[in-house]
């Protein structure tokens, strides 16, 4: 079993999943980085998975497909950005040779956003970040994002590791602390992220349980978050979806 990631474009991530000779690249936005990642592990991925269609995640797909002869999978709702060979819509699990990858639709950041589940990990694309959630400026819908975060994402196992499409932790965590200045776990996570950066290391992945303790977008039901949001956005009602929509608007204004 192989699981690895590489950073590109400053804060994007591409991922490699492999079971024996069967391998997949996830979001190969930079083809050279993605192909080098596969080569470093001595595998030839036959599959490319997309969490959503934005170009910073799909821009390397054409070259990777040609280089590897790979099959491209993604949600057809995002086909305006890229052309999947296979649509993952309506499929709870993908059988990719020996790889078994769960599929959770999470529309919002884009209409076709999905989370992939594999061996205790959630590859969340731009739906859920460490300490934050994706914006909806480029074809997204804040209410659909809110319903995804309070519905299918909230239902996922808390033990899952979170592997997002970008590392925005050092930007997101202070926003959450501004809403909950007494959140000791959020402060500790920010300190750990900054320490890793100072040491030239990648941040350790969080778990969904940890995100539920530090990420305001997963804490819309918590009174301290709800009240802090309503002070800043009085138009927000008390329900969780309304709070997440207001959070997205507040975060966009930072």
Where are the regions a protein language model picked out?
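Core dinuclear metal-dependent hydrolase active-site scaffold
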Residues: 16-18, 93-117, 152-155
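Accessory terminal helices/loops
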Residues: 150-161, 168-254
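Short active-site segment of divalent metal-dependent hydrolases/proteases
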Residues: 55, 112, 129-130, 134, ...
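Active-site HxH/HxHxD metal-binding segment of metal-dependent hydrolases
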Residues: 9-10, 23, 30-103, 188, ...
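Active-site-adjacent loop/tail segments of enzyme domains
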Residues: 132-159
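Conserved beta-strand hairpin/beta-sheet module of binuclear metal-dependent hydrolase folds
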Residues: 1-41, 114-131
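Active-site neighborhood of phospho(di)ester-bond hydrolases with catalytic His/Asp-centered motifs
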Residues: 26, 46-54, 71-76, 106-108, ...
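Divalent metal-coordination and catalytic microenvironments
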Residues: 17, 27, 52, 64, ...
